[in-house]
Amino acid sequence: MLVFYAILFVTVFSNTVMGATIDKPIPKPIFREAIEEMEVNKRAKNPYCKEEKCPVGKHCPKKPIVCRIGPCCV
């Protein structure tokens, strides 16, 4: 009888605890938010004009300026 209860406990415990944590996938919006946050962090680390991003014939201004959208070459 004790063996029966032990097996029953193990099956119920594994189905409720392990099944609740392993079987449920992570929702896709969480991944999307994480990717967007990484993109924002990349832009925040490099806010200034970079000479290598400027097209041919254009250069960054002498005074360092923060580029919000695209390269700020003049």
UniProtKB/Swiss-Prot annotation:
Principal subcellular localization: secreted
Keywords tagged on the record: Cleavage on pair of basic residues, Disulfide bond, Ion channel impairing toxin, Neurotoxin, Potassium channel impairing toxin, Secreted, Signal, Toxin, Voltage-gated potassium channel impairing toxin
PTM annotation: Contains 3 disulfide bonds.
Expression tissues: Expressed by the venom gland.
Recorded GO MF terms: potassium channel regulator activity; toxin activity
Record's subcellular location: Secreted
Presence of keyword DNA-binding: no
Residue intervals passing through the bilayer: none
Signal peptide: 1-19
Propeptide: 20-41
Cellular component, GO, one term: extracellular region
Protein name per Swiss-Prot or TrEMBL: Kappa-scoloptoxin(07)-Ssm2f
Organism expressing this protein natively: Scolopendra mutilans (Chinese red-headed centipede)
